[in-house]
Protein backbone atom coordinates (compact mmCIF):
# COMPACT_ATOMS: atom_id res chain seq x y z
CA UNK A 1 0.00 0.00 0.00
CA UNK A 2 2.38 2.65 -1.15
CA UNK A 3 0.98 5.49 -3.22
CA UNK A 4 1.15 8.98 -1.70
CA UNK A 5 2.85 12.07 -2.85
CA UNK A 6 3.73 13.91 0.35
CA UNK A 7 5.66 16.96 -0.78
CA UNK A 8 4.71 19.14 2.15
CA UNK A 9 1.48 21.03 2.47
CA UNK A 10 -0.60 19.12 -0.04
CA UNK A 11 -2.69 20.32 -2.96
CA UNK A 12 -2.98 23.68 -4.63
CA UNK A 13 -4.24 26.43 -2.38
CA UNK A 14 -4.24 30.20 -2.71
CA UNK A 15 -2.74 32.37 0.00
CA UNK A 16 -3.89 35.98 -0.28
CA UNK A 17 -1.67 38.75 0.97
CA UNK A 18 -2.04 42.45 0.12
CA UNK A 19 -4.38 41.65 -2.76
CA UNK A 20 -1.91 39.26 -4.36
CA UNK A 21 -2.54 35.58 -4.83
CA UNK A 22 0.36 33.34 -3.86
CA UNK A 23 -0.18 29.87 -5.28
CA UNK A 24 0.99 26.71 -3.65
CA UNK A 25 1.23 23.89 -6.16
CA UNK A 26 1.93 20.56 -4.50
CA UNK A 27 -0.31 17.59 -5.15
CA UNK A 28 -1.72 14.96 -2.84
CA UNK A 29 -1.76 11.28 -3.46
CA UNK A 30 -2.42 8.11 -1.51
CA UNK A 31 -1.40 6.01 1.44
CA UNK A 32 2.38 5.85 1.47
CA UNK A 33 4.28 3.30 3.53
CA UNK A 34 6.94 5.29 5.33
CA UNK A 35 10.43 3.99 5.94
CA UNK A 36 11.10 3.07 9.55
CA UNK A 37 14.33 4.97 10.02
CA UNK A 38 16.16 5.50 13.28
CA UNK A 39 15.73 3.61 16.55
CA UNK A 40 14.42 6.09 19.11
CA UNK A 41 10.73 5.37 18.60
CA UNK A 42 11.22 1.66 19.05
CA UNK A 43 13.28 2.25 22.14
CA UNK A 44 10.57 4.51 23.56
CA UNK A 45 7.92 1.91 22.82
CA UNK A 46 9.98 -0.69 24.62
CA UNK A 47 10.46 1.55 27.65
CA UNK A 48 6.74 2.30 27.78
CA UNK A 49 5.99 -1.41 27.83
CA UNK A 50 8.39 -2.21 30.66
CA UNK A 51 6.86 -2.89 34.01
CA UNK A 52 3.73 -4.46 32.57
CA UNK A 53 2.91 -8.12 32.12
CA UNK A 54 2.55 -7.57 28.38
CA UNK A 55 6.03 -6.06 27.97
CA UNK A 56 7.57 -9.08 26.19
CA UNK A 57 4.62 -9.33 23.80
CA UNK A 58 4.74 -5.60 23.11
CA UNK A 59 8.45 -5.79 22.33
CA UNK A 60 7.85 -8.66 19.92
CA UNK A 61 5.08 -6.71 18.18
CA UNK A 62 7.32 -3.69 17.75
CA UNK A 63 10.04 -5.89 16.29
CA UNK A 64 7.55 -7.42 13.86
CA UNK A 65 6.43 -3.95 12.75
CA UNK A 66 10.09 -3.13 12.19
CA UNK A 67 10.62 -6.27 10.14
CA UNK A 68 7.48 -5.74 8.07
CA UNK A 69 8.42 -2.25 7.01
CA UNK A 70 12.05 -3.07 6.46
CA UNK A 71 10.80 -5.66 3.97
CA UNK A 72 8.71 -2.99 2.26
CA UNK A 73 11.78 -0.94 1.28
CA UNK A 74 10.73 2.04 3.37
CA UNK A 75 14.15 3.67 3.47
CA UNK A 76 14.04 4.17 -0.29
CA UNK A 77 10.56 5.67 -0.07
CA UNK A 78 11.62 8.08 2.62
CA UNK A 79 14.47 9.22 0.42
CA UNK A 80 12.03 9.85 -2.43
CA UNK A 81 9.79 11.84 -0.10
CA UNK A 82 12.76 14.02 0.79
CA UNK A 83 13.48 14.69 -2.89
CA UNK A 84 9.83 15.63 -3.41
CA UNK A 85 9.98 17.95 -0.43
CA UNK A 86 13.13 19.72 -1.55
CA UNK A 87 11.58 20.28 -4.97
CA UNK A 88 8.43 21.63 -3.33
CA UNK A 89 10.56 24.01 -1.28
CA UNK A 90 11.88 25.48 -4.52
CA UNK A 91 8.31 25.93 -5.77
CA UNK A 92 7.32 27.74 -2.58
CA UNK A 93 10.22 30.16 -2.90
CA UNK A 94 9.46 30.90 -6.54
CA UNK A 95 5.80 31.56 -5.83
CA UNK A 96 5.89 33.32 -2.47
CA UNK A 97 9.23 35.16 -2.19
CA UNK A 98 11.15 34.81 -5.48
CA UNK A 99 14.85 35.54 -5.22
CA UNK A 100 14.78 36.11 -1.45
CA UNK A 101 15.32 32.59 -0.15
CA UNK A 102 18.74 31.54 -1.32
CA UNK A 103 20.90 29.30 0.83
CA UNK A 104 19.03 30.24 4.01
CA UNK A 105 15.76 28.87 2.66
CA UNK A 106 17.48 25.77 1.29
CA UNK A 107 18.89 25.10 4.75
CA UNK A 108 15.48 25.50 6.40
CA UNK A 109 13.79 23.14 3.94
CA UNK A 110 16.62 20.65 4.28
CA UNK A 111 16.11 20.57 8.05
CA UNK A 112 12.33 20.23 7.78
CA UNK A 113 12.67 17.25 5.44
CA UNK A 114 15.29 15.48 7.55
CA UNK A 115 14.69 11.79 6.90
CA UNK A 116 15.64 10.62 10.39
CA UNK A 117 13.18 12.99 12.01
CA UNK A 118 10.43 12.17 9.51
CA UNK A 119 10.95 8.48 10.12
CA UNK A 120 10.73 8.94 13.88
CA UNK A 121 7.42 10.78 13.63
CA UNK A 122 5.82 8.10 11.48
CA UNK A 123 7.47 5.23 13.30
CA UNK A 124 6.12 6.37 16.65
CA UNK A 125 2.59 6.54 15.29
CA UNK A 126 2.78 3.14 13.66
CA UNK A 127 4.13 1.49 16.80
CA UNK A 128 1.14 2.88 18.70
CA UNK A 129 -1.63 2.25 16.17
CA UNK A 130 -0.54 -1.25 15.14
CA UNK A 131 0.17 -2.45 18.67
CA UNK A 132 -2.92 -4.70 18.77
CA UNK A 133 -3.02 -5.70 15.10
CA UNK A 134 -2.42 -9.28 13.94
CA UNK A 135 0.49 -8.78 11.57
CA UNK A 136 0.64 -12.36 10.28
CA UNK A 137 -1.54 -11.82 7.15
CA UNK A 138 0.43 -8.69 6.28
CA UNK A 139 3.76 -10.44 6.79
CA UNK A 140 2.60 -13.35 4.65
CA UNK A 141 1.43 -11.19 1.75
CA UNK A 142 4.30 -8.71 1.67
CA UNK A 143 6.81 -11.51 2.23
CA UNK A 144 5.55 -13.40 -0.82
CA UNK A 145 6.97 -13.11 -4.32
CA UNK A 146 3.92 -11.11 -5.41
CA UNK A 147 4.12 -8.84 -2.38
CA UNK A 148 7.78 -8.09 -2.96
CA UNK A 149 7.12 -7.49 -6.64
CA UNK A 150 4.38 -5.01 -5.78
CA UNK A 151 6.66 -3.18 -3.36
CA UNK A 152 9.33 -2.87 -6.03
CA UNK A 153 6.85 -1.57 -8.60
CA UNK A 154 5.44 1.00 -6.18
CA UNK A 155 8.86 2.35 -5.28
CA UNK A 156 9.99 2.45 -8.91
CA UNK A 157 6.86 4.38 -9.91
CA UNK A 158 7.32 6.91 -7.12
CA UNK A 159 10.90 7.43 -8.17
CA UNK A 160 9.93 7.78 -11.83
CA UNK A 161 7.31 10.41 -11.04
CA UNK A 162 10.02 12.71 -9.70
CA UNK A 163 10.52 13.51 -13.39
CA UNK A 164 7.84 15.98 -14.57
CA UNK A 165 7.86 14.46 -18.05
CA UNK A 166 7.08 11.01 -16.67
CA UNK A 167 4.23 12.38 -14.59
CA UNK A 168 2.77 14.20 -17.58
CA UNK A 169 2.97 11.02 -19.65
CA UNK A 170 1.24 9.05 -16.88
CA UNK A 171 -1.58 11.59 -16.80
CA UNK A 172 -1.94 11.49 -20.58
CA UNK A 173 -2.09 7.70 -20.49
CA UNK A 174 -4.82 7.82 -17.85
CA UNK A 175 -6.84 10.29 -19.91
CA UNK A 176 -6.68 8.01 -22.95
CA UNK A 177 -7.79 5.02 -20.90
CA UNK A 178 -10.69 7.03 -19.52
CA UNK A 179 -11.73 8.05 -23.02
CA UNK A 180 -11.69 4.38 -24.04
CA UNK A 181 -13.47 3.26 -20.84
CA UNK A 182 -10.64 0.77 -20.31
CA UNK A 183 -11.57 -2.17 -18.10
CA UNK A 184 -8.33 -1.77 -16.13
CA UNK A 185 -9.77 1.34 -14.52
CA UNK A 186 -12.43 -0.79 -12.82
CA UNK A 187 -9.70 -2.94 -11.27
CA UNK A 188 -7.78 0.10 -10.07
CA UNK A 189 -11.01 1.68 -8.87
CA UNK A 190 -11.78 -1.28 -6.63
CA UNK A 191 -8.32 -1.03 -5.10
CA UNK A 192 -8.61 2.73 -4.54
CA UNK A 193 -12.06 2.36 -3.01
CA UNK A 194 -10.99 -0.47 -0.70
CA UNK A 195 -8.27 1.77 0.71
CA UNK A 196 -10.32 5.01 0.59
CA UNK A 197 -7.36 6.55 -1.16
CA UNK A 198 -9.07 9.57 -2.67
CA UNK A 199 -11.27 10.57 0.26
CA UNK A 200 -8.63 10.15 2.93
CA UNK A 201 -6.05 12.06 0.93
CA UNK A 202 -8.47 14.91 0.31
CA UNK A 203 -9.06 15.19 4.05
CA UNK A 204 -5.33 15.01 4.69
CA UNK A 205 -4.68 17.71 2.11
CA UNK A 206 -7.22 20.06 3.69
CA UNK A 207 -5.70 19.48 7.12
CA UNK A 208 -2.21 20.11 5.79
CA UNK A 209 -3.27 23.30 4.04
CA UNK A 210 -4.88 24.54 7.23
CA UNK A 211 -1.66 23.84 9.14
CA UNK A 212 0.26 25.78 6.49
CA UNK A 213 -2.09 28.75 6.93
CA UNK A 214 -1.62 28.58 10.69
CA UNK A 215 2.13 28.61 10.23
CA UNK A 216 1.90 31.65 7.96
CA UNK A 217 -0.34 33.43 10.45
CA UNK A 218 1.90 32.60 13.40
CA UNK A 219 4.85 33.96 11.44
CA UNK A 220 3.08 37.23 10.62
CA UNK A 221 2.73 36.70 6.87
CA UNK A 222 -0.70 38.33 6.65
CA UNK A 223 -0.95 42.11 6.79
CA UNK A 224 -4.56 41.70 7.86
CA UNK A 225 -4.85 39.09 10.59
CA UNK A 226 -6.88 35.99 9.68
CA UNK A 227 -8.85 34.17 12.35
CA UNK A 228 -9.34 30.42 12.35
CA UNK A 229 -12.75 30.57 10.69
CA UNK A 230 -11.34 32.60 7.79
CA UNK A 231 -8.53 30.07 7.34
CA UNK A 232 -11.02 27.22 7.28
CA UNK A 233 -13.11 28.99 4.63
CA UNK A 234 -10.02 29.70 2.52
CA UNK A 235 -8.92 26.08 2.70
CA UNK A 236 -12.38 24.57 2.20
CA UNK A 237 -13.15 26.56 -0.93
CA UNK A 238 -10.31 24.68 -2.62
CA UNK A 239 -11.82 21.27 -1.81
CA UNK A 240 -13.30 20.65 -5.30
CA UNK A 241 -9.98 21.40 -7.00
CA UNK A 242 -8.09 19.29 -4.47
CA UNK A 243 -10.45 16.37 -5.04
CA UNK A 244 -10.08 16.51 -8.83
CA UNK A 245 -6.29 16.75 -8.64
CA UNK A 246 -6.13 13.94 -6.09
CA UNK A 247 -8.19 11.60 -8.25
CA UNK A 248 -5.99 12.28 -11.27
CA UNK A 249 -2.77 11.70 -9.35
CA UNK A 250 -4.05 8.59 -7.59
CA UNK A 251 -5.10 6.80 -10.76
CA UNK A 252 -2.12 8.01 -12.79
CA UNK A 253 0.16 6.58 -10.14
CA UNK A 254 -1.72 3.31 -9.74
CA UNK A 255 -1.85 2.75 -13.48
CA UNK A 256 1.87 3.39 -13.82
CA UNK A 257 2.93 1.33 -10.82
CA UNK A 258 0.74 -1.70 -11.44
CA UNK A 259 1.03 -1.80 -15.23
CA UNK A 260 3.06 -5.07 -15.20
CA UNK A 261 0.54 -6.78 -12.90
CA UNK A 262 -2.43 -8.82 -14.06
CA UNK A 263 -5.95 -7.89 -13.02
CA UNK A 264 -5.99 -10.96 -10.79
CA UNK A 265 -2.80 -9.90 -9.00
CA UNK A 266 -4.20 -6.44 -8.30
CA UNK A 267 -7.45 -8.00 -7.10
CA UNK A 268 -5.51 -10.14 -4.63
CA UNK A 269 -3.95 -6.94 -3.27
CA UNK A 270 -7.43 -5.45 -2.99
CA UNK A 271 -8.60 -8.54 -1.12
CA UNK A 272 -5.84 -8.03 1.46
CA UNK A 273 -6.83 -4.38 1.78
CA UNK A 274 -10.40 -5.38 2.65
CA UNK A 275 -9.37 -7.63 5.54
CA UNK A 276 -9.43 -6.24 9.07
CA UNK A 277 -5.63 -6.37 9.13
CA UNK A 278 -5.34 -4.55 5.82
CA UNK A 279 -7.77 -1.89 6.98
CA UNK A 280 -5.83 -1.50 10.24
CA UNK A 281 -2.61 -0.99 8.31
CA UNK A 282 -4.23 1.58 6.05
CA UNK A 283 -5.68 3.52 8.99
CA UNK A 284 -2.35 3.44 10.77
CA UNK A 285 -0.53 4.78 7.74
CA UNK A 286 -2.95 7.63 7.20
CA UNK A 287 -2.83 8.55 10.90
CA UNK A 288 0.95 8.55 10.78
CA UNK A 289 1.12 10.65 7.65
CA UNK A 290 -1.46 13.06 8.98
CA UNK A 291 0.80 13.81 11.94
CA UNK A 292 3.84 14.04 9.68
CA UNK A 293 2.24 16.38 7.16
CA UNK A 294 0.71 18.59 9.83
CA UNK A 295 4.16 18.99 11.35
CA UNK A 296 5.87 19.67 8.03
CA UNK A 297 3.14 21.99 6.76
CA UNK A 298 3.09 24.08 9.91
CA UNK A 299 6.86 24.42 9.89
CA UNK A 300 6.97 25.34 6.21
CA UNK A 301 4.30 27.97 6.73
CA UNK A 302 6.08 29.47 9.72
CA UNK A 303 9.41 29.52 7.89
CA UNK A 304 7.94 30.92 4.67
CA UNK A 305 6.31 33.73 6.64
CA UNK A 306 9.72 35.01 7.68
CA UNK A 307 10.86 35.23 4.08
CA UNK A 308 7.59 36.71 2.83
CA UNK A 309 8.07 39.46 5.37
CA UNK A 310 11.69 39.91 4.36
CA UNK A 311 12.98 38.71 7.73
CA UNK A 312 15.88 36.41 8.49
CA UNK A 313 15.17 33.22 10.38
Predicted features along the sequence, with ranges:
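N-terminal secretory signal peptides that target proteins for export/translocation
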Residues: 1-20
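Bacterial N-terminal signal peptides
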Residues: 25-37
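Sec/Tat signal peptide C-region and signal peptidase I cleavage site
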Residues: 39-43
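N-terminal Sec/ER secretory leader and immediately downstream segment
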Residues: 45-164, 300
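Second-shell loop/turn segments in exported
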Residues: 54-55, 71-75, 106-113, 122-126, ...
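Outer-membrane beta-barrel domain signature
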Residues: 153, 158-166, 170-172, 177, ...
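Extended amphipathic alpha-helical interaction segments
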Residues: 158-259
